[in-house]
Each structure stands twice: as structure tokens, then as C-alpha cells.
Amino acid sequence: QPWFNNGLHNLKHKAVDAQVIKEKNGNVKLTFTVVSQAPNAAQLQSKNGRYDSGIHTLIEHNDRPFGENDFKFTSNQIWTIYPDGSIELQSAITSSNPGVVLARLGYEMQVPAQLDQLAYYGRGPIDNYNDRKTGQFIEQFKSTVAKEFINFPKPQQMGNHEETRWASISNKAGKGLVVVNEQPYAFSALNHSAMDMTMATHPHRLPKSDVNYVTIDAMVTGLGGNSCGQGGPLPHDRAFGAPTRMGFIIRPMGAKGGVEVSTASQKPLL
């Protein structure tokens, strides 16, 4: 509920400053200052107060719009578009409340559902989190979006892979994209959004989706031990709204001149 109180499910992004720079080498840089804030808070309600009742309702507090002093993110972004189709992002993210605990901090993109073949160099093959990752070794793995889904009785976040060096998502013909970060990052690719999984009380209630959701995160909050009574994750295993810098590059793969991944160095060939 604290995430709904801050409107994190419904962030709207507004560029308050923008510049376009064309470089002689053919690169194009786009710089933005982006403010991300929800219109208002919301409240998640369940029938009879039971979270497993089968019916969830999200009540938006439209009568209490957010203002300047309510929670928001501000990010300074530099996007560089290269002649080969690669897109690089350098981002510095701050929030109005550095102490707020977040589910994750990073970026999400939607890709066509036909892009369902995964390869990654990180912790796997079982999904893992900050406080439950050392049992999964860092190797190169192949998977599919369908295999990343875990049939929990109550749908929830899943499929996270910590300390990822690079990850690719493609169609069965091998055409798609590869994401490489400056530092190891958390990666997931699922056929359902976080909101879909929050609202669905059982797997059969998940709506069909024609897109896959790919997350690239600087930090993901760990799981803790609430299910067994030990409490939430420790502070160092939580994602906070504190100032964060992250950068990654998205490169095309499968097309002529696209990127290939070196199995020797486990890094993309630049």
C-alpha cells in the first residue's frame, strides 16, 4: 500500500527541459530533464478485506491531486543514438524522498510478444534477488519468456536475475536487441506487468498480453522473510529513492551489422 500512496503504479513523465545535439560523427544526443509523478494516490481494496478473495479494486483518489510537495522523481537523461541503430542512456535519478523504499529502481520497456527468446549472462537459471542470489551462479543462460513465469497461487513479481552483465531478447529468427549495462544490473522479462500481477488473485485471472515487459534495474528490493515471520529485507537489500546513476546501451541483434555476443569475454563486441 505505501507504493500506491506515492502513486508509483501510475507515474506520468514530463520533460521540463530538452536539447538535441547532432554530432559530426553521425551520433545524435538528446538530453532531457524529466519529472515523474503520479496524478494522485490510490488504495488497493479486496473483497471482505481478504487479499485472496478473487476480487481486487484500485481506488484512485482523484479528489486529492498531487502537488509540488508530493512524491516525485527527477531524472537527468542523455540519450545517444548511434548510426548503427544502438541507443545509449545515461541517467541520474533523484527523488523527493531519498528514504522511501521502492520495489525497484530503473527502467521498463515493452517489446512485441514475438520477442520471447532470452539469453543472459548473470545469475540463474532460477530467479534470484539481492538477499537470495548466491545459490545461483553467474553463467551464460538461455531461456524463454514463458519459462520465466512461475505458477504461484497468487501472481507476484518473479523472474528477476541479479548481477546481469548483458541480456538479449529476440524472436525465433534471432532478431531482437541486447542490453549491456556499465555495471551489473537486475534483469527480468515477463509477459505480464507488475500491475497485472498485483491485481490478479490467481494465475487464471491474469489478462492476455500482446507485449513482453523487460526491466533493467539498478536495484531491486530483496524478498526478506515475511512469509515465515522473520520480517522484511535488511536495509542494504532494499531499493531506496536515494540519488542513483545508471547507464546502459541497447543494441540491435540479428540484422546485418548487428551486435554479436562474445562467448570468450562474455561482453558484446563493440
Located regions from the model:
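Beta-strand/loop-rich accessory regions of lumenal/periplasmic or secreted enzymes
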Residues: 1-270
